Amino acid sequence: MNYRHIFHAGNFADVFKHLLLARALEYFQQKNKPYFVLDTHGGIGYYDLQGDQAVRTAEAEQGIVRFAEHSAEEPLAGAYLNIVRQLNEEQDKLRYYPGSPVITSEFLRENDRLVVCELHKEDAETLKNTPLGRHKQVQILAPMDGYQAVRAQLPPAEKRGLVLIDPPFENTTEFDDVVSALEQGLKRWKSGSFAVWYPIKDELKTAAFHRDVGALSDLPKTLIMELNIRTNDERKGLHGCGFLWVNPPYGVVQDSEHLLPVLCKTLAQDKGANFHSRWLVGEQLLT
């Protein structure tokens, strides 16, 4: 594995991903019953945006820095932005960015549970040495293949919860691996909520991924949400990303109708920016 998320931490894709993740966790909190979260690709947990690697790309400047400045009063982003602010309360400017396991940990109550996986050996060691490693409700399985954890950890004792599948997509088989993981996960936990983040680089590959997921037998309702911040230009790096969300929380479905336009307007880099959402299975066309 060569991918290191520190180069991209806090970019537009992280804002898209983590804002919707935070909204989902807020809805899970609304019921008294405990919930379970499996994060298959946890990274290192905390990211220093002033470190050499992050500064080299400066992607956070067009991501979380811009979003925090221009959407500070957005009600649906309140919990997400508060987590970011609390991590930086002793800083003159935004320096540290929380990865998905850190964000999830902020929503855990006494009986809720988070299992985090990370395969990259160096990142796994870093993750274990963060405050997450001392969190009573958090179990870090690292180094471990997150796809194997889908088979090993499901179904959880808790009746409800979320699986976040957020791989680096550096392997040519990654989309196929995700489809296989979804198939295995749904066999074990049909009522679980499965959120798959993916990059949009090749429209044909993205369409094939949607088609392959849609071909799974007895697939529950599945929502696709996508954000493109500029016209596709390979020389400028990643231009778009999406969530394929099986059994999405109802509140997230409703929130996305408001948040996708906000994200697009705030993070757009040229006139080619756009967003859309649609049901792959079930419900109706949204935007």
Task: Place the predicted regions along the sequence by residue.
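Class I S-adenosyl-L-methionine-dependent methyltransferase catalytic core
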Residues: 1-287
